Amino acid sequence: MIMILYWSLPMILFILGLFCFVSNRKHLLSMLLSLEFIVLMLFFMLFIYLNMLNYESYFSMMFLTFSVCEGALGLSILVSMIRTHGNDYFQSFSIM
């Protein structure tokens, strides 16, 4: 019974994070927050999986390191976008 709770809670939160990521497409900051929530739930599921199989947690630490680098890169893009355009709306941001 506890194993079902270990797997169902992160999956529900992962799906909730995906829903927030898809529904908040106007602001870059809300997209970055929901993306970090998704990565955190993936880390939690990976940690549970590795502990169930009695593996070492070095891979989860590497995953956490790369997710921190991804978050820092996203925040730097957000800061540069706000400096050039004045806001974080995707409507005012043009790739061309």
Curated annotation (Swiss-Prot):
Reaction it catalyzes: a ubiquinone + NADH + 5 H(+)(in) = a ubiquinol + NAD(+) + 4 H(+)(out)
GO molecular function: NADH dehydrogenase (ubiquinone) activity
InterPro entries: NADH_UbQ_OxRdtase_chain4L/K (IPR001133), NUOK/Mnh_C1-like (IPR039428)
KW Endoplasmic reticulum (keyword) present: no
Assigned keywords, A-Z: Electron transport, Membrane, Mitochondrion, NAD, Respiratory chain, Translocase, Transmembrane, Transmembrane helix, Transport, Ubiquinone
Subcellular location per the Swiss-Prot or TrEMBL entry: Mitochondrion membrane
Main location: mitochondrion
Name of the protein described by the UniProt record: NADH-ubiquinone oxidoreductase chain 4L
Species per Swiss-Prot/TrEMBL record: Drosophila melanogaster (Fruit fly)
